[in-house]
A protein has these predicted regions:
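Intrinsically disordered, low-complexity segments enriched in polar/charged residues with Gly/Pro
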Residues: 39-43, 70, 116-120
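Short, well-ordered turn and helix-capping elements at secondary-structure junctions
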Residues: 17-19, 67-70, 114-117
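Residues that cap or initiate secondary-structure elements
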Residues: 19-23, 61, 89, 138, ...
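Vicinal oxygen chelate
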Residues: 1-23, 73-153
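Short C-terminal domain-edge/linker segments immediately following a structured domain
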Residues: 43-48, 86-87, 95-100, 112-116
Length: 153
């Protein structure tokens, strides 16, 4: 039997946060950083319980949902969620903006850009990525993925 159902798409990440991090100043800091670096904006939380901060990514139905909670989520330093960019220049521009922000706010964490190539039977794949963190318990991995026919880089 052939399955013609399209696979479901990931549409959001929900993270519980220390309520003190999501006070008025904390929300302003989160909105400023993620707005400046990633272009994310505050979404409408009307009707939501617990006064979450919703960061919309600009793509329809995709968002990061930050909910004040006690206890908040804790995670090891490399736990993350990922976003995919279409152009390598976009990835480098995001890193440049994050480094600019880091120059005046030491809460910004950046793991520098790294590329690796995986060899497949018919194609090779080059994954370029970086990790960026700011006050959330999870970092954001920014990825750019290119598929190459064998012998064509």
């Amino acid at each position: 039997m052939t399955n013609t159902t399209k696979p479901a798409k990931l549409n959001h990440v929900a993270i519980t946060m220390d309520p003190r991090v999501l006070d008025d100043q904390g929300r302003a800091d989160v909105l400023d950083f993620y707005g400046e670096v990633f272009g994310w904006r505050e979404g409408d939380n009307t009707g939501e319980t617990g006064n979450p901060l919703i960061l919309t990514t600009g793509a329809f139905g995709q968002f990061v949902y930050l909910l004040p909670a006690d206890p908040p989520m804790t995670a090891p330093p490399l736990d993350h969620f990922g976003i995919l960019v279409d152009e390598l220049d976009e990835l480098h521009a995001i890193v440049t903006r994050a480094k600019g922000y880091q120059a005046h706010d030491d809460r910004v964490k950046i793991i520098d850009v790294h590329a690796r190539t995986t060899h497949g039977p018919t194609h090779d794949y080059t994954l370029t990525s970086t990790y960026i963190g700011f006050v959330l318990p999870l970092m954001v991995e920014v990825q750019h993925l290119v598929r190459h026919e064998h012998g064509r880089f």
